[in-house]
């Protein structure tokens, strides 16, 4: 007589449906902290390396950042202004260059403890957040910066000659790139809220009137310039990102 156990939960039929981490190897808290320390050190060393390389190539980077300001002469208004501004630019470049590597280290750290379902959600979100941030920076450089600078240069150009401070210009352009990159993270926030069940896509659609007001305010806050053209472009981009996030949630049926 062939007897088959009736309480075997891990049969060939249902083993594929068991949601457990693929690398389910127990680690002590000390081991977790040691791994976290090592990966943090890797990220810091990569940041130092990227910042150093950026500083050695600062003339090329400065030329790229100056490109949107066509016809503008930059002045050094204080001793060492160019030097300290160069350090600031190199640090910003180091942060941007390190971000993908930092996300990669985060993925390696959390990957062993994730279930198959969690991997399908978290890993694409992490990768998408980096891509969206880079896309936001590119959008700011090729769209927002030229629009803002064209307005600021042309306004009153027949009365005053535009001579700009090197440091103030780079504060302006770097803040514009950073704020736009952060604004492009809106769909990621929406996905997190939708997947967690905090807000549904239908609730986000019903809030469209408030979102228009918020987008207008965000356009004024996130753009370092006060010209209406740049603020309008930024507000429109925020709205498109918001409704794009809703479309993704609708596809996911959230």
UniProtKB/Swiss-Prot annotation:
The chain crosses the membrane at residues 41-61, 64-84, 91-111, 125-145, 146-166, 172-192, 204-224, 232-252. One of its GO terms (cellular component) is TAT protein transport complex. One of its GO terms (biological process) is protein transport by the Tat complex. It comes from the Eukaryota. Keywords: Chloroplast, Membrane, Plastid, Transmembrane, Transmembrane helix. One of its GO terms (molecular function) is proton motive force dependent protein transmembrane transporter activity. It is a multi-pass membrane protein. InterPro entries: Sec-indep_translocase_CS, TatC. The keyword DNA-binding does not apply. It is found in: Plastid, Chloroplast membrane. Belongs to the TatC family. This is Uncharacterized tatC-like protein ycf43. The gene is ycf43.
């Amino acid at each position: 007589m062939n007897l088959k156990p009736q309480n075997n939960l891990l049969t060939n039929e249902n083993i594929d449906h068991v949601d457990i981490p693929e690398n389910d190897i127990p680690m002590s808290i000390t081991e977790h902290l040691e791994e976290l320390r090592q990966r943090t050190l890797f990220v810091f060393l990569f940041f130092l390396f990227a910042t150093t390389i950026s500083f050695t190539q600062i003339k090329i980077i400065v030329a790229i950042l100056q490109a949107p300001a066509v016809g503008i002469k930059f002045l050094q208004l204080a001793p060492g202004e160019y030097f300290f501004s160069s350090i600031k630019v190199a640090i910003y470049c180091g942060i941007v260059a390190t971000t993908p590597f930092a996300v990669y280290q985060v993925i390696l750290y959390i990957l062993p403890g994730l279930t198959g379902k969690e991997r399908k959600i978290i890993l694409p979100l992490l990768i998408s957040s980096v891509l969206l941030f880079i896309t936001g920076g590119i959008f700011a450089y090729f769209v927002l910066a030229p629009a803002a600078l064209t307005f600021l240069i042309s306004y009153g150009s027949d009365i005053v000659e535009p001579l700009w401070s090197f440091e103030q210009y780079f504060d302006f352009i770097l803040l514009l790139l950073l704020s736009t990159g952060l604004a492009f993270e809106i769909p990621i926030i929406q996905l997190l809220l939708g997947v967690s069940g905090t807000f549904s896509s239908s609730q986000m659609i019903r809030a469209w009137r408030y979102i228009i007001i918020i987008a207008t305010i965000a356009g004024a806050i996130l753009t370092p310039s006060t010209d209406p053209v740049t603020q309008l472009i930024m507000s429109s981009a925020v709205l498109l990102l918001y409704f794009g996030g809703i479309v993704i949630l609708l596809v996911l049926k959230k």
